[in-house]
Design a protein with these regions (language model features):
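Short, small-residue-biased leader/transition segments that mark boundaries at the very start
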Residues: 1, 5-12
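Short, flexible, glycine/charge-rich loop motifs used to bind or transfer phosphoryl groups or to couple energy/partner
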Residues: 1-2, 59, 112-114
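Conserved non-cysteine loop/helix-boundary elements of the Radical SAM core domain that shape
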Residues: 10-67, 76-93
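Terminal RNA-binding accessory module
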Residues: 73, 84-181
Length: 181
């Protein structure tokens, strides 16, 4: 998990960020080659963030295709260096940028989840829903922050805490549906 904010290709000394866009993309490529799930958090509206920098961030998010992305708008904390920085971004601009980022990420999540349709995955059963359904999570979904997998179990509903194989059958931007094998 890596927290980001909009950044040009130079290093950002404002947040003591160690790395450039190219450094992050190299890490992303390595993680993808190993089949890892990529997640990050993004601060929108950090002081001094320009529209051009924000568009560069959107391009970066589109190129990177994080599996999971959380975002929040910057809010000044008393006593921090950023709270005293010039060029504070207006709330309305921060909210607009946040909405644009989340809309983009929703499309990315849907695209990445659709790519999982037909795959067989091991999931941890987290709850039973009755009528032959249960909820679960694979190694790609973090508890309390990511979507869930709704599983049709048939006549045998496994108990929470068991790992079961499923085939992903449907995908939404955040949640998946599957069939127990």
């Amino acid at each position: 998990h890596r927290e980001l904010h909009s950044f040009p290709t130079r290093r950002s000394s404002d947040l003591r960020f160690r790395g450039t866009r190219e450094d992050i993309l190299r890490c992303v490529r390595g993680a993808r080659e190993r089949g890892l799930t990529l997640r990050t958090s993004i601060i929108v509206g950090f002081p001094g963030e320009t529209e051009d920098q924000f568009r560069e961030l959107l391009d970066f998010v589109e190129e990177t295709e994080f599996d999971r992305l959380g975002a929040f708008t910057y809010s000044p904390e008393e006593g921090t260096p950023a709270a005293k920085m010039p060029d504070q971004v207006p709330e309305k601009v921060k909210e607009d940028r946040f909405s644009r980022l989340m809309l983009l990420q929703q499309k990315i999540c849907l695209r990445r989840n659709k790519a999982r349709i037909g795959s067989v995955e091991q999931v941890l059963v987290t709850a039973t829903e009755g009528d032959g359904f249960c909820l679960g999570r694979s190694s790609r979904e973090a508890p309390e922050t990511d979507g869930e997998i709704y599983i049709h179990c048939g006549k045998t509903t496994p108990e929470p805490g068991l790992f079961i194989p499923i085939r992903i059958s449907e995908a939404g931007p955040y949640d998946l549906k599957g069939e127990m094998l």
